[in-house]
Amino acid sequence: MKLLAPVLWAMAALGVTWLVAVDSKESCTKHSNGCSTPLRLPCQEYFRPACDIHDNCYHCGTIFGISRKECDDAFLKDMNTLCKKLGSNSATCPARGKREVTSHRATSIAHSRLWKTALDQKSFLNRKARQVFFLLPTTCQGWAKNYHLAVKLAGANSYSVTTDLETCQGLEHCLPNH
């Protein structure tokens, strides 16, 4: 029994730190809506940690003296850091769900066949779709730039200048550079 007590204490201590880490991670999603876009875009789930920090920065940035520009710049930096973690696979963001079991090449081939079939038709809408398709980025870094541009152009109304200090207490670790 003498040996069991220290082991139980150690397990309890590790369990508490794990619970604190989980709780702290969960608190960072309190003011976040993820990478909300009207469309399902590539990298949306992969960029979610950066989006959570960005959303918290927009909600609580003024309380901690972080400007909207600083939030947006940190957002781009965080997304580029995520892209660099992909290493040589930085051409595309990892897929989620069922597509994870397929290779990146197989998924790309399947996508290109679907696009080719859809765009081979000669309608006006398909001509427009072809134009848009060729403007879309093909790399993780390209998508990061697009997400960054989107918040720069359309995020002004979301940056909060009237946030209550009480709602942001304990969220310092959810902000850029903290």
Curated annotation (Swiss-Prot):
GO terms for molecular function: phospholipase A2 activity; toxin activity. Keywords: Calcium, Disulfide bond, Hydrolase, Hydroxylation, Pyrrolidone carboxylic acid, Secreted, Signal, Toxin. It is found in: Secreted. The modification 4-hydroxyproline is found at P38, P42, P49, P137. The keyword Signal applies. The keyword Secreted applies. Residues 98-130 form a propeptide. Its cofactor is Ca(2+). One of its GO terms (biological process) is phospholipid metabolic process. It catalyses: a 1,2-diacyl-sn-glycero-3-phosphocholine + H2O = a 1-acyl-sn-glycero-3-phosphocholine + a fatty acid + H(+). Transmembrane segments: none annotated. GO terms for cellular component: extracellular region. PANTHER family: AGAP006772-PA. Catalyzes the calcium-dependent hydrolysis of the 2-acyl groups in 3-sn-phosphoglycerides. Belongs to the phospholipase A2 family. Group IX subfamily. This is Conodipine-P2. It comes from Conus purpurascens.
